[in-house]
Structures are given as C-alpha cells and as structure tokens.
Amino acid sequence: MKLNQNLKNLLAPTKPKVQFANKNISKDIILYMDSVSVSFDGFKAINDLNLTINNGELRCIIGPNGAGKTTMMDIITGKTRPDEGSVYLGQYTNLLEMSESEIACAGIGRKFQKPTVFESLTVYDNLSLAINGNKGVFASYFGKWRKLNGEQNDFMDNVLHVIGLEHTRHYLASVLSHGQKQWLEIGMLLMQKPQLLLIDEPVTGMTHGEIERTAELLTDLAGEQAIIVVEHDMEFVRQIARKVTVLHQGHILAEGTLSEVQNNRQVIDVYLGGGH
C-alpha cells in the first residue's frame, strides 16, 4: 500500500541533536563505513570494507555464505567491534563509541531472518511494547506500556496501516501467518522511528503473495528510512533493488545495478555461478 504524505511525515525518523560533524562524510550519507576490518582467531571476516548508504536508500547486499554479511551488520549494531576502521550514522554519530542499546536508540533497527515477536501478545500489544521499549519487558508485562497517549495511538494506527495489519490488531501474534509475523516485526521497528533498517533475508519461507507484499512494503518505506536488505532470493532482489552490493571474503567485490553485478565475471565465478 502506497504511503500518503501524512503517513510519510509520521514515519519520518527523529533527527539526532547536532554534534561535531565528520567532515569526510557528505550530509546525504546515513551510513559510513571506512576501512573496516575484523578478525576472529586469525580469520579476517571483514577485510578493509568501505561502504556508504545514502539517506532513504534501499540497498541489497548479496554474496556467498561466509562473505561477511552478518558480521557487517553485527558491526553496525555494536554487537561486534572492528579491529580497524570508522563507522558513522550520518555525519555526527560515531557508532564505535556506543553500546548496542545506544545504537538502537540512535536510530538503527535490525530484523533477523526469523521473526521475533511475542506470540502470546496481540498485534496491538507487540507494537505498544516496541514504542515503549525503553521501559523494559518486565514493566511491559505488567501493563504499564498500555497507557498510550492520543498521539502514540494515532501513530500506531498509521503503522498498522502501512504494514497491512490494521484488521488483525487484536489477534494474538501466534495466529498470524509467517509473512504477517515478519511485517509485524518490521512494524515494531517502525514504532521506534529508525533512520536505518537492517533486514536479514525477510522473504525466506513466505508465500508468493507475501513476497510480493513485502517487496511493496520495503520499496514504499525507502525514502523515509534507509534500508539494507541482505538476501539470497535473486528474484526478490530484482523486485526491490536499485543498487546491489556484492560481498566476498569480507570486502566489496562489485557494486551497481542488479544487471551490472549479474554480468560481472568475478561475481559469476564466486557467487552466481553456484545456481543463484
């Protein structure tokens, strides 16, 4: 479902307070990774990685298993600290100086491949939990997060509309289809008004119709949030990607349109030649 301007305004991420800018980073860039490397027991999982994502961009990351895709997302979210390099959210926020929780609060939301919703709670309650996530799960289960104000309720209504679950708000999450659970988790991230979404293989296990709806959802959201999608399903990548980055052995092997990377001889040899 296409977003009208009112919905776009409501979903627009909260901008951080102005700090000292990194002058190497353009104001158009939301994610900046420069010369990033990390090793585990002598194995270089990320090797001199340089990656920039623009505000509102939807970028697909592809590559063979072990290429460094998960480690890259771990570094962005603070789960893994690199041995070398710089990682910034926009011009002002040095992610390497922040904890995982601080990074999440700064505006980076991550969705893993398997949906992680609270199945014993309703769709409404899952979204309520997300909007007041800083209160903690203990407080949430005792109902303190249910007292949303009018603005928060309006915002939730809009998120439900965007993810296509407005008619299931009082359903338990356990009765939702796999695709609906994925959309609910995306909605939970949207409740926090992120600047950047990291989404890992969102369409695995979905029906054809759910895949089509997910493609529409992500392309509609791009522009308000920047989105990085890690995906192996090349047909899905074809539906959503304007620009594709191919990772191999921890660094960028190729970058460009899907057509450009599919015709790149190195990409064919190390990835697409395997039947992808």
Describe the residue ranges of each PLM region.
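Conserved ABC ATPase "signature" region
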Residues: 20, 139-168, 216
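Conserved structural motif at the start of ABC-family nucleotide-binding domains
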Residues: 26, 31-33, 46
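The feature captures the beta-strand-to-loop junction immediately N-terminal to the Walker
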Residues: 62-64
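Helix-to-loop junction immediately C-terminal to a conserved catalytic motif
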Residues: 77
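ABC ATPase NBD Q-loop/coupling interface
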Residues: 86-106, 143-146
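Conserved ABC nucleotide-binding domain
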Residues: 96-97, 159-175, 180
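Catalytic Walker B motif of ABC-type/P-loop ATPase nucleotide-binding domains
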Residues: 197-201
